[in-house]
Each structure stands twice: as C-alpha cells, then as structure tokens.
Curated annotation (Swiss-Prot):
This is Eukaryotic translation initiation factor 3 subunit H-B. HAMAP family: eIF3h. Keywords: Cytoplasm, Initiation factor, Protein biosynthesis. CDD domains: MPN_eIF3h. The gene is eif3hb. The keyword Protein biosynthesis applies. It comes from Danio rerio. The lineage of its organism: Eukaryota, Metazoa, Chordata, Craniata, Vertebrata. Component of the eukaryotic translation initiation factor 3 (eIF-3) complex, which is composed of 13 subunits: eif3a, eif3b, eif3c, eif3d, eif3e, eif3f, eif3g, eif3h, eif3i, eif3j, eif3k, eif3l and eif3m. Component of the eukaryotic translation initiation factor 3 (eIF-3) complex, which is involved in protein synthesis of a specialized repertoire of mRNAs and, together with other initiation factors, stimulates binding of mRNA and methionyl-tRNAi to the 40S ribosome. The eIF-3 complex specifically targets and initiates translation of a subset of mRNAs involved in cell proliferation.
Length: 333
C-alpha cells in the first residue's frame, strides 16, 4: 500500500493528492508495454508503484499485467501482483502500490469497468490514481498521459451503492463531478535532460517545420463517429427513463383512483351500518416499476464530454498550425 512521508515536525499530512510526479522511466515502460502487447483495440494495464510526499504522489516504477486468454483459468492476478512487489522489495526498489495504468484509443476510457476498478483501488488505498495513456495521440507528436481520481462525492455514492435518480440528485453528482484530473509532472535525471538538450540542438529547421503539419483527418473522423455512437446510447437511455416515468405516473394514478373508490365504498357501507372493507396491502397490489440504473447514463455523458474535449483540442491545434503557417509564409505569398 502507499505510504506517506512525515513532515519535518513529525506530523503526517492527510491532504488529498494535488500533483503527480512521474519518472521518465515509468512513462517509457508504459509506452513500451503497449507497443509490445497492445494490438488494435487491445487494452493493456499495469500497476503503479511509488510513495506519497505531503500532497504529491511520486510514481517511481511500474510493472504490467500479463495478457492472458480464457485458457489461463488458473492465472491469479492478486498472487501475481504480490510476487512482483515481493521481488521488487528484495532488490530495494519502491514497491508501494499507488494505483494502476491503462491504455485507451481516441479517449474512450470512461466505462463501468474503469469506475469499479478505480473505486476498489481508491477505497483500499486513498491516494490511488489511474493513468490513462492514449497511443494514437502520442504517435502524432504529443505525449497523451493523464491521471484521474474519483471525486469524494462519487466515492460516497459508490460506497452506498445508491445509483437511483434521487440518490444522485441528493449527492449533487453529475457527469462533471465524477472524475477529477490530477496534474502530472515528468521528472528526468540530469543526464537525460542533457541528452534531450543535445537532441534539440541537433534538430534541423526542417524537422521543426514538420511540427506545423496538420494532424490526420482520420483521427477526427473516428472521434466524431464514436461521439455519435455514444449520443445514440444516451438517446436510448433517455427513452428508457421516459418510459419508466410514464409507467410510474400511470401506476400512481391507478393507485389514487383505487384508494378513492375504496373510500367511497366504505362511506356507503358506513351509512348502511355495515362494517368497512378490510384494508389491503397496496404495495403488493401496485408494485412500482423497477427504475433504470442512472450510473450508466452518467458514464455515457462523461464519455461524451471527453470526446468533445478531444475534438476541441484536435481542432484548436490544427487551427493554430494554420495561422502559424500563414504567418511564416509572409504577406508576399
């Protein structure tokens, strides 16, 4: 589990993680893991190791989850993690569990599986984070590595397992209050920084002008297609909820009419001196329809928001490149 370093006055801080410092070696390991085992839409995952210093989470190492098929029924992930951390401890490497990482394609990572996994990690280890690595965006020239945590409000909802509309409304949980992004700082050794500086000095002007090349339109096309698919899913969920609301309203109306008829009958029987009708259990007679789960709808809305942000970043970068290219060409052209 993660461990907090004590402050100079001997007190342990319980403030939430506000920043993540990740070693460059860890970033390279994550990229290498996807290049070796990620095929097409295959998702790769692994464990993050490190420690917590005050309000900063330091990620110093990681190791991957091996890919296994249905034939590997005897594979135990928990046992595998324990063996790996025990081996790292023997060679004096940080072995404290601080989260996990996962690859994604086109930013499509918001799912119930990720929510359940991160809740399990964060419930057991308060400082846990999940790193999301997008290899497609990284291949276009900019490293796409983001860290997320579940918000305190969502953690409470998941603990209570109350995903009804009333529960979510009472807790004020919307799609924008599900995940919180934690800023990442990549730390390299002095030798690596010197090497990067030398590579920058050796790069030619032609190489630098390649940065103005527009990104592939296929990325935008795929993002828009996935956005449309999620909007269709949202539309279907809205239809299901509207049908539930109509069924509930119709049943409440029938229940109200039944109660009124019973009251009128009892009033007539009382006027004739007859005993009132026996009371009946209305909850058994009018069972309310099962409400559809709202958490899936929130996840879809959150994923739609992520796609919109991805498309916004993509288009803004290309527009910026167009303006810079126009400025470099000069007024004569």
């Amino acid at each position: 589990m993660a461990s907090r370093k004590e402050t100079p006055n001997g007190k342990t801080l319980d403030t939430p993680v506000k920043q993540i410092q990740i070693e460059g070696l860890v970033v390279m390991k994550i990229i290498k893991h996807y290049q070796e085992e990620g095929q097409g839409s295959e998702v790769v995952q692994g464990v993050l190791l490190g420690l917590v210093v005050e309000d900063q989470l330091e990620i110093t190492n990681c190791f991957p989850f091996p890919q296994h098929t249905e034939d590997d029924a005897d594979f135990d992930e928990v046992q595998y993690q324990m063996e790996m951390m025990r081996s790292l401890r023997h060679v004096n490497i940080d072995h404290l569990h601080v989260g996990w990482y996962q690859s994604t394609l086109y930013g499509s990572f918001v799912s119930r599986a990720l929510l359940d996994s991160q809740f399990s990690y964060q419930h057991a280890i308060e400082e846990s984070v999940v790193l999301i690595y997008d290899p497609i965006k990284t291949a276009q020239g900019s490293l796409c590595l983001k860290a997320y945590r579940l918000t305190p409000k969502l953690m409470e909802i998941c603990k209570e397992k109350d995903f009804s509309s009333e529960g979510l409304k009472k807790a004020s949980v919307g799609y924008e209050h599900m995940f919180e992004e934690v800023p990442i700082v990549i730390k390299n050794s002095h030798l690596i920084n010197v090497l990067l500086w030398e590579l920058e000095e050796k790069s030619t002007a032609a190489d630098k002008h390649e940065l103005l090349s527009l990104s592939s339109s296929s990325h935008l096309e795929k993002s828009l297609q996935m956005l449309m698919d999620r909007v269709d899913d949202m539309s279907q969920d809205i239809v299901k909820y509207n049908n539930y609301s109509r069924s509930l309203s119709k049943q409440q109306q029938q229940k109200h009419q039944y109660v009124q008829r019973r009251q009128q009958e009892n009033a007539q029987r009382q006027s004739r001196g007859e005993p009132p009708l026996p009371e009946e259990d209305l909850t058994k007679m009018f069972k309310p329809p099962q409400p559809p789960p709202r958490m899936d709808t929130l996840l879809i809305a959150s994923q739609i928001n992520t796609y919109c942000q991805t498309i916004k970043e993509f288009t803004s970068q290309n527009l910026g490149k167009l303006f810079m290219a126009e400025a470099l060409q000069g007024p004569s052209s």
